[in-house]
Design a protein with these regions (language model features):
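Sec/Tat signal peptide C-region and signal peptidase I cleavage site
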Residues: 16-20
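Flexible loop/turn connectors
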Residues: 280-348
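Hydrophobic alpha-helical
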Residues: 124, 128-148, 217, 235-298
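An alpha-beta-alpha
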Residues: 70, 89, 180-227, 231-233, ...
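Hinge/cleft segment of the Venus flytrap/periplasmic-binding protein
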Residues: 21-66, 202-205, 317-375
């Protein structure tokens, strides 16, 4: 761990507010801002294809003028991706001087729970709500209710087709799939393979990022200079035990023919033990659609070969800063969508990768709430 990351780890543990404001000030983040008009009821990738796209850097917002209260509705806290998002939210809440309450549901099969959290946030009269929707469309009515109550609603990471959102902060979810799959294709070419068989563990069906992963993989496969056969796609919640079962079923059907498995942040690590147990450790290579601290360690140890990186910490930083800027009335023209630029990690660049833009510091203990009045 380098000195900066060690300092951030110690800072998170002690929670000193004055020091936190210094340490948490992030470097400007490469983004694409997408301005209206955009395709109605579309995804972030639809906005990218239809809106006015302005590349740039997202700089840290100035300290808030008042103690704004912002609720963050996460789908769960069961994998390290959301721990990284929580770190980005809480560290920036300290720096900005605002209240942040993270209200997680119990998982991607807990839409009812997330809708209830939205009702609670509306009833509690938060100044803004930032939601990571479980569904592309099933959260739309609750988002509209919040807006009707006069509460701005922003989106973080998970995509939605709601036109009632004030702002989306995410990445090109389709690019998650294309970039991870293109890495697989380059690796296969370097190995001299003329065709490859792959299987996908993309996560829960119905989540916007899962569709993006699969669509992106299909696009990259169609454009590939070699034959790419997608033998199997197994959907399910990103809970580790379930994903290990799904990986086992893939191996039972296709293990002898399979070259690669591409999986989500909770899915890719879960495939490793079944692969080893089935005796395919030297045959099947695992690549991840996104990056967590766990996956970074597995890449360093050469158990996972590569990961696309949606930079969850950076997304969370931009989301809370954008919420504060919106509440403060800063800025002349509000974009429809802000896309954070993707990264790509493998064993070649792991020694120089800027992990502080993507994952929580080593040893970070998740905190779900911050109130500057209690510092």
């Amino acid at each position: 761990m380098n000195k900066t990351r060690l300092f951030l780890s110690l800072l998170a543990a002690c929670g000193a507010p004055a020091l936190a404001q210094q340490a948490a000030r992030f470097a400007p983040i490469p983004v694409m801002s997408i301005f209206r008009p955009v395709q109605p009821n579309g995804t972030a990738d639809d906005a990218l294809a239809s809106g006015r796209v302005v590349p740039g850097l997202y700089a840290p917002a100035a300290h808030a003028s008042k103690r704004w209260r912002i609720a963050f509705l996460f789908p769960h806290m069961k994998d390290p991706y959301w721990s990284g998002c929580a770190y980005g939210v809480i560290s920036e809440a300290r720096r900005l001087g605002v209240v942040a309450d993270i209200l997680p549901a119990a998982g991607y099969d807990d839409l009812k729970g997330q809708l209830q959290k939205m009702d609670e946030a509306i009833a509690a009269k938060y100044d803004a709500i930032v939601i990571s929707p479980i569904s592309m469309t099933a959260n739309n009515n609750s988002i509209a209710r919040a807006r009707a109550a006069g509460i701005p609603v922003l989106e973080l990471a998970n995509d939605s087709r709601s036109d009632d959102l004030n702002l989306k902060v995410t990445t090109s979810l389709r690019a998650m799939g294309t970039e991870a799959t293109r890495w697989v294709i380059r690796d296969a070419q370097q190995r001299g393979l003329k065709s490859i068989n792959i299987a996908l563990l993309p996560g829960p069906m119905g989540a916007g990022w899962v569709k993006g992963e699969v669509d992106g993989t299909r696009i990259a496969a169609q454009e590939a200079p070699l034959e790419v056969n997608i033998l199997d796609i197994r959907y399910g919640d990103s809970e580790r035990g379930l994903q290990s079962q799904l990986a086992g079923r893939i191996l039972q059907r296709h293990g002898n023919r399979l070259d690669y498995i591409i999986g989500c942040t909770g899915c890719a690590p879960a495939a490793l033990a079944p692969i080893r147990a089935a005796g395919y450790g030297d045959k099947i290579r695992v690549v991840a659609y996104d990056l967590t601290g766990e996956i970074a360690h597995l890449i360093r140890s050469k158990e996972i070969y590569a990961a696309a990186d949606t930079k969850g910490v950076s997304q969370a930083r931009v989301a809370i800063n954008a919420a504060v800027n919106l509440l403060e009335g800063r800025g002349k023209e509000q974009p429809h969508t802000i896309l954070i630029k993707l990264g790509m990690l493998d064993q070649q660049n792991a020694g120089s990768y800027p992990f502080d833009t993507s994952v929580a510091p080593d040893g970070y203990k998740v905190v779900l709430s911050h109130d500057p009045a209690k510092d």
